[in-house]
Amino acid sequence: MAHYHNDYQKNDEVEFVRTGYGKDMVKVLHIQRDGKYHSIKEVATSVQLTLNSRREYLHGDNSDIIPTDTIKNTVQVLAKFKGIKSIETFAMNICEHFLSSFNHVIRVQVYVEEVPWKRFEKNGVKHVHAFIHTPTGTHFCEVEQLRSGPPVIHSGIKDLKVLKTTQSGFEGFLKDQFTTLPEVKDRCFATQVYCKWRYHQGRDVDFEATWEAVRGIVLKKFAGPYDKGEYSPSVQKTLYDIQVLSLSQLPEIEDMEISLPNIHYFNIDMSKMGLINKEEVLLPLDNPYGRITGTVKRKLTSRL
């Protein structure tokens, strides 16, 4: 028999702002076998539930709590019975399950991150069951659904590291008594892309295709044409160009947030050794680093 404390006294000086609980980093590898041709999705999933009462906080009464171990088991079972066509669809399946199965669950938040496995391929021939880990951008999604509404779906790319050795500069910036940074017309530009976007609705969206399209736009606007590149006068301009092209080509996207750290590579001074280093040997610096962010959304008139 469950016991809980009944010595609660109302406190008029504090109130709840938000509550939630759940299970983080539930890892599964789902294998879809079509004869000898196998497809895989490996994911790490985190689930947060909000209940319609707070008796577990106020009284220590656990009678409404769905154990986090049950949440973990549910994620695994849904992977078995629903499969993982896309991580966004999988996250929506999790939201739908908890809202339809438990009347006292009023909000579900799901974060899913996909491990970047890529099928072995040689001369256009794809291997039937072998994959290689390719860290060229991690696909993640965040889905939140209230009992009274549709799911709100975000997808994103993170840990996409890119570098170019020229076609970037930084000039004309504000200078004061503390400025020591020289203007530069030509420099290395390196960053690790974090890009997250929101869908205006989740019906009839090919989430995998949209993710690949955004990733392609990021690479296109960063690198430019393969034979000559594209000049970047600032990290801010490159960030904005990615957003504008993404929203112009992908009508399913409502808004987009991007964060770009400016990862520095500095020329090593070899003059004390009697050598002139012409930007051939650079020193990578992990920190400190600049970080540039920006979020854009469609204007109301653009939706009409």
From Swiss-Prot:
The modification N-acetylalanine is found at A2. Transmembrane segments: none annotated. Urate binds at T68, D69, F170, R187, V235, Q236, N262. Pathway: Purine metabolism; urate degradation; (S)-allantoin from urate: step 1/3. It is found in: Peroxisome. One of its GO terms (biological process) is purine nucleobase catabolic process. It catalyses: urate + O2 + H2O = 5-hydroxyisourate + H2O2. One of its GO terms (molecular function) is urate oxidase activity. The modification N6-acetyllysine is found at K10, K23, K27, K36, K118, K122, K164, K175, K185, K221, K228, K278. One of its GO terms (cellular component) is peroxisome. Keywords: Acetylation, Oxidoreductase, Peroxisome, Phosphoprotein, Purine metabolism. It comes from the Eukaryota. The active site is at K23 (charge relay system), T68 (charge relay system), H264 (charge relay system). It holds the Pfam family Uricase. Catalyzes the oxidation of uric acid to 5-hydroxyisourate, which is further processed to form (S)-allantoin. PANTHER family: URICASE. Homotetramer. This is Uricase. It comes from Bos taurus (Bovine). The gene is UOX.
